[in-house]
Every structure is written in C-alpha cells, then in structure tokens.
Amino acid sequence: MQAVKRSRRHVEEEPTMVEPKTKYDRQLRIWGEVGQAALEEASICLLNCGPTGSEALKNLVLGGVGSITVVDGSKVQFGDLGNNFMVDAKSVGQSKAKSVCAFLQELNDSVNAKFIEENPDTLITTNPSFFSQFTLVIATQLVEDSMLKLDRICRDANVKLVLVRSYGLAGFVRISVKEHPIIDSKPDHFLDDLRLNNPWPELKSFVETIDLNVSEPAAAHKHIPYVVILVKMAEEWAQSHSGNLPSTREEKKEFKDLVKSKMVSTDEDNYKEAIEAAFKVFAPRGISSEVQKLINDSCAEVNSNSSAFWVMVAALKEFVLNEGGGEAPLEGSIPDMTSSTEHYINLQKIYLAKAEADFLVIEERVKNILKKIGRDPSSIPKPTIKSFCKNARKLKLCRYRMVEDEFRNPSVTEIQKYLADEDYSGAMGFYILLRAADRFAANYNKFPGQFDGGMDEDISRLKTTALSLLTDLGCNGSVLPDDLIHEMCRFGASEIHVVSAFVGGIASQEVIKLVTKQFVPMLGTYIFNGIDHKSQLLKL
C-alpha cells in the first residue's frame, strides 16, 4: 500500500451554489457568496462624479453593488472629456450626474442607478438626513469644511464614509466610521488551529491508538499523519522536561531531531512534514493578545443596544473563561497531509466534532445573553454564530478617529516623526499641502495655480498658508520643501485620469472590505505620491 497525500477535497463535498453566478465567478473566489450578497444589498452614494469618483464607482458597479446614487450639480464641460471616461462629446452641457450615471448603468444593468443634480456641499448643509438611507458614502473632492460636516452626519446616522481626493500627482483615501468589526479577516498567513500542544480528550484518545514504534509493515509507518506524530512527540518531550515544551533555539532543534529519530526510512514524507510543521508545537497556547484585548473591551459588557458582534464577543469571553479553558472555539479544519485515508478521515471527524461542540456551547451562551438583555434569543442567525466561531482567533476591530478630531487635536508627535523621516516626509508634506490648499481656496476663492498668471504669488501664498497650518498643528519651526510647494501649485487642483483611476481603485477596494466585512481596511490616511511613486499610510 502506497502513502498518499490526503486533502480536504477528497473527503468534503464542495458547496453547491443555489444560483450560478458566472458573471461574478472570479470575485466569488475571493469573498464568497456571503460577501457577494452583502455587496448586492449595499446602497452606495457618490458625491462628485469627476474622474476620481467615476473610477471608484465603476469598480463597484462591475462588482455588482446593489444600488448607486450619484450626486453632482455641475454640467459636463469640454475639459471633462480628457479625464473622465464616463462622459462623451454628446454629454457636453448636460448634467454630469445624469451622464455618468447612464454610462455606469451600461456597465451592469443589474445595478439600480440613480442621480441627483445638486451640489454636494449644499446637500450636506441643507439636507443632512439624506445620507441616512445609504450603506456607505464615497465623498470625492470635498474641501475641509464639507468633510468635517459630512463626517459628523455619517457618524450620527451610523453610515460608513470613505473620503477620496485626487489632486494633480497626489491623492488620499481616508475611511471614517465609529467602529468596524471584522469576523472573516482573511489574514495572509495564520497558524492552523491544530492544538498540537494542548490536545482535547478525543484527540488524545485517537493519538494513543497509534503506535509510532511499530515499523512493520513499513507502509503503515508512512501513513501516520503528522498531527499524530507531533502530539505524541510533544507529550514525550513534556514528560522529560518537567511539563515544558521547547522554547530555546537549541531545544527546538533537539525536538526536531527527536522527531527525525523516529523515522524508519528516508522516504517517509509524513515525518518530513512533521519536522517542517514542528514550529506549530512551539506556538503559545490560548488566545492572542489582540483577541484578549477584544474580550476585555468595555463594549463586551453588553446591553440592549449592543450589536450582534459584541453579543458574540461576550459569549466568547464566557467560553474562554469556562469551557474553552483559555482557548477559543476550535476552527475544525485540518490541512492536507500525507496519511492513509482512514486516518485522515478519522482525524477530520475528530476536529469537526470538537468544532461543532464548541459552536453549540457558544450558540447557547449567545441565546442566554440575548435573553438577559431583553432581545430575541434567535435574533442572531446560526450561520453568523458559526462563522464567528470558525474565525474567533482572527477577529479584528477597527476604530477610526473623527476627521474633526484629527484636524483639531492633531497628534503632534506623529506628525513630527513623519516629517523627520526621509521615507515618509513626502507623504506628510502632501497631507499638509492638501489641507493648506483648502485653506488657500477658502481665503482666495481659488486653488493655488488654478488659473494662468500669478503663479509666483500663489507659491508665496501657499507657503505662508502651509507654515500657518504647521504652527496650528503644533509643529513650530517645521518647514516643507520649496520643490513640493512649487509642484502643488503646478498641479492647479487638476484631476489627472491616471492618478484618479489609481486612487479611485484604492477607494473601491476599501469600500468592498467595509461592505463585505472581510479583509482588514486601512487604518489611517492613505497618501499617494505620484512624484516619488509611493503609496503610504499615515496613522494620525
């Protein structure tokens, strides 16, 4: 009998889709049907549909977002034909919102597309309740005053906000939302939840039925899964080391040598896998510091207004302190490995059974908590709780400062650190100058370098404005490079299509993260520096 590498594919049925969605096949592989459903239920509002906004919304329309509302009070001009693919020569003189909306609708007829011919700045001031109907607002090319007002409005209405700006060869993207919990964070690299150094009774019992010292028949020795090998080796090591596992480099090497010593022949792939996976034995037990911080958060003390996420976190806290014995619920999946079919299936059943048992405990605790706070015990669906349990070790929570707080109460230490850092000084310079440009516009009714003539005067004025802003930020004595100020004036507040497409693409990527509640969105202000070809995140 020959050893074969067993995979989940061989023993698990692939989920079948209720309705084939070949249209979105590629993206379904990334965020799945649950993510796609969230996208199709989302209602997105775009403020200003210049090239930056059009490019951001284009990506979402192609992705199958449920509905879009385009808000812009301007008319299409000849200049728009050179930087916005969502208008054409026939659109000149017509409503920009209407033209862009029509072109976007052509890209995906299943999206519900609407437009409103109104200046976004006016709408923000006169009709703040308008924004409460949306899942998320993408606000492009807004000046500082409008950004601050809109941020307050969206926070009060619990609507997610993404601020986007393209300005010459620079741009920024800034997310603003009170808090954004992520259950399925999809980390690039994460340790398998195998509990090799902390096996539960059923796994222990299974491991004890297999003897590593039996070398005949040779095929049987080659079929022992590495999970079994490592659980046994970890136990053997602990017995001879006062219950401790390898911790130093020398001990870890010694442990691997111990595993290697159990090999009968040099062609045993299962033992090679065990040696490669030995680091999983050295991993610390229990939950991560990040999850610990989450269950210790004041929001985990739930009340009738708590979100489903915090109710489940409260249940997780109880589980970790009781049934879990310091551990989160087991994920229940095992990786591919060299094994006999029988061993692999038995092992898989043991992991799945433990995961199901942990889920049932969490589910019961969720129901009890809901009952205690006066809510319907069945108000959180079973699939949601199951997903929470499966991803309990990977939970993330993003909290964002209000834009007003960032502007009015700046983190002086961080700003000075970025300005002094050769690698980040360009990004910080653009952050300052983008804000200075808005002050400039408020004072002189135009952006620096926006009109022909008077460039030298605009450069001088922008420099003075930037220095004044730096002083207000608590950075007395700090200066920005003259070259950067000159470039900012040369930009003339233009939206260059290639920059708009890039910045708009980044914005739409973050929107998808926020809507699907998968992957971790950016924390901070993303700055695109087209001069130095850099993308950097400023945490202010």
UniProtKB/Swiss-Prot annotation:
Cellular component, GO, one term: nucleus
Molecular-function GO term, any one: nucleotide binding
The entry's keywords: Auxin signaling pathway, Nucleotide-binding, Nucleus, Ubl conjugation pathway
Tissue specificity annotation: Expressed in shoot, root and floral meristems, in vascular tissues of cotyledons and mature leaves, and in the stele of the root. Expressed at higher levels on the lower side of an emerging root during germination and at higher levels on the underside of the apical hook.
Disrupted-gene phenotype: Impaired meiotic recombination characterized by a shortage in bivalent formation due to a mislocalization of class I crossovers (COs) and correlated with strong synapsis defects. Dwarf plants, highly branched, with small crinkled leaves, small flowers and short fruits, symptoms of fertility defects.
Major subcellular location class: nucleus
Pfam families given in the database record: ThiF
GO biological process, one term: response to cytokinin
Signal peptide: none
Cell compartments where the protein resides: Nucleus
Pathway(s) it belongs to: Protein modification; protein neddylation
InterPro entries for the chain: APP-BP1, ThiF/MoeB/HesA, ThiF_NAD_FAD-bd, Ubiquitin-activating_enz
Record function comment: Regulatory subunit of the dimeric ECR1-AXR1 E1 enzyme. E1 activates RUB1/NEDD8 by first adenylating its C-terminal glycine residue with ATP, thereafter linking this residue to the side chain of the catalytic cysteine, yielding a RUB1-ECR1 thioester and free AMP. E1 finally transfers RUB1 to the catalytic cysteine of RCE1. Plays an important role in auxin response. Regulates the chromosomal localization of meiotic recombination by crossovers (COs) and subsequent synapsis, probably through the activation of a CRL4 complex.
Family (UniProt): Belongs to the ubiquitin-activating E1 family. ULA1 subfamily.
Quaternary data: Heterodimer of ECR1 and AXR1. The complex binds to RUB1/NEDD8 and RCE1.
Protein name: NEDD8-activating enzyme E1 regulatory subunit AXR1
